[in-house]
Amino acid sequence: LCPLDVLQLSSELLDIDGNEVEASRILSDITAFGGIRCPLTVVQSRGIGTIISSPYRFIAEGHPLSLKDMDGWFRVSDDEFNNYK
């Protein structure tokens, strides 16, 4: 999806109910869209997932972050070849 190396958020991230988004469990080695293998997937505590996407390779404090809800997961790749971690 989106090649990201670092994700830093200075304040808490809230879901649509105003609750803090938390990574409560990790699912290992699943297949994503188009048969791409995702060795690490983090699921929100309430089971509502998001995909984090950005035009920036590194997201740091001060950069805009746009979240798009899609199919219950978010994935972060570690390089331009979309090797997910």
UniProtKB/Swiss-Prot annotation:
GO MF terms here are: antioxidant activity; serine-type endopeptidase inhibitor activity
Biophysicochemical property: temperature dependence: Stable for 7 days at room temperature and for 30 days at 4 degrees Celsius. Remains active after incubation at 100 degrees Celsius for 3 hours.
- Keywords assigned by UniProt, alphabetized: Antimicrobial, Antioxidant, Fungicide, Protease inhibitor, Serine protease inhibitor
Q: Name one GO biological process term.
A: killing of cells of another organism
Signal sequence span per UniProt? none
* Modification after translation, per record: The N-terminus is blocked.
Q: Which family does it belong to?
A: Belongs to the protease inhibitor I3 (leguminous Kunitz-type inhibitor) family.
Q: What role is this protein assigned?
A: Inhibition of trypsin. Has anticarcinogenic activity, prevents transformation of DMBA-treated JB6 cells. Has antipromoter activity, prevents promotion by tetradecanoyl phorbal acetate (TPA) in JB6 cells. Prevents tertiary butyl hydroperoxide-induced mutagenesis. Protects AT base pairs and shows antimutagenesis activity in TA102 and TA104 S.typhimurium mutagenesis tests. Inhibits paw edema formation induced by phospholipase A2 in Swiss Wistar mice. Prevents the release of arachidonate, the parent compound for the synthesis of prostaglandins and prostacyclins.
Q: What is this protein called?
A: Turmerin
Q: What species does this protein belong to? A: Curcuma longa (Turmeric)
